[in-house]
């Protein structure tokens, strides 16, 4: 198995990227996670009243604030369970554009995040001349789909790590994976750090 440094990315670094982060970490992968949004947005007491936090706000703080605000509501909609999972993985949501790390594979969870990562890589320039495979696995932003999507990402990550020549084999690996996961559309691009 190849030692690949991986990353998972969604908009707020809360649901999809964190479920995939958890699953990959538990499987022994070297993984980090980020969000591409301008802020962390979570459902609020009404559709037009989301809870908005700055990236870097500790998951513990968000958990405690929402629990004090309306524990019954945020338990029923799964937010407190999600935040409890997240705080066991890392301290706080992190923003993609603020990191300085280098990855072999970046998994994004929706097309706009894929585009944001690809744009950011181009803006950074190719200083290290180090390729990175950016793979979008389109996952709807709800608990059930994040669990299904994370398992799909894990299977794809294992196939990528098992390859003898990732650059030469990646298209075949993704084609085979896509046949097995037709409800999780894939996109792929090569960027550079």
UniProtKB/Swiss-Prot annotation:
Annotated disulfide bonds: none
Swiss-Prot/TrEMBL GO biological process terms: intracellular phosphate ion homeostasis; mRNA 3'-end processing; positive regulation of telomere maintenance via semi-conservative replication; regulation of pericentric heterochromatin formation; regulation of siRNA-independent facultative heterochromatin formation; sno(s)RNA transcription; termination of RNA polymerase II transcription; termination of RNA polymerase II transcription, exosome-dependent
Enzyme nomenclature, EC number: 3.1.3.16
Subcellular location: Nucleus
UniProt cross-references to InterPro entries, sorted A to Z: Ptyr_pPase_sf (IPR036196), RNA_pol_II_suA (IPR006811)
Keywords noted in UniProt: Hydrolase, mRNA processing, Nucleus, Protein phosphatase
UniProt cross-references to Pfam families, sorted A to Z: Ssu72
Catalytic activity: O-phospho-L-seryl-[protein] + H2O = L-seryl-[protein] + phosphate; O-phospho-L-threonyl-[protein] + H2O = L-threonyl-[protein] + phosphate
GO molecular function: protein tyrosine phosphatase activity; RNA polymerase II CTD heptapeptide repeat phosphatase activity; RNA polymerase II CTD heptapeptide repeat S5 phosphatase activity
Enzyme's top EC category: hydrolase
GO cellular component, one term: chromatin
Function: Component of the cleavage and polyadenylation factor (CPF) complex, which plays a key role in polyadenylation-dependent pre-mRNA 3'-end formation and cooperates with cleavage factors including the CFIA complex and NAB4/CFIB. SSU72 is required for 3'-end formation of snoRNAs.
Membership in a protein family: Belongs to the SSU72 phosphatase family.
Subunit comment: Component of the cleavage and polyadenylation factor (CPF) complex.
Name of the protein in question: RNA polymerase II subunit A C-terminal domain phosphatase SSU72
Lineage start: Eukaryota, Fungi, Dikarya, Ascomycota, Saccharomycotina
Gene name tied to this protein: SSU72
């Amino acid at each position: 198995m190849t030692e690949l440094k991986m990353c998972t990315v969604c908009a707020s670094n809360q649901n999809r990227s964190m479920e995939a982060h958890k699953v990959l970490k538990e499987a022994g992968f070297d993984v980090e996670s980020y969000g591409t949004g301008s802020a962390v947005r979570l459902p609020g007491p009404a559709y037009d009243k989301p809870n908005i936090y700055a990236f870097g706000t500790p998951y513990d703080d968000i958990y405690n604030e929402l629990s004090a605000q309306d524990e019954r509501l945020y338990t029923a909609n799964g937010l407190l369970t999600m935040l409890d999972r997240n705080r066991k993985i890392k301290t706080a949501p992190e923003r993609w554009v603020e990191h300085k790390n280098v990855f072999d594979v970046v998994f994004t969870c929706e097309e706009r995040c894929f585009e944001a990562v690809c744009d950011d890589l181009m803006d950074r320039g190719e200083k290290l001349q180090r390729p990175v495979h950016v793979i979008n696995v389109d996952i709807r932003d709800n608990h059930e789909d994040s669990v299904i999507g994370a398992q799909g990402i894990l299977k794809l990550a294992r196939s990528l790590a098992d390859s003898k020549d990732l650059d030469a084999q990646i298209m075949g690996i993704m084609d085979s994976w896509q046949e097995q996961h037709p409800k999780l559309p894939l996109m792929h691009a090569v960027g550079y750090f």
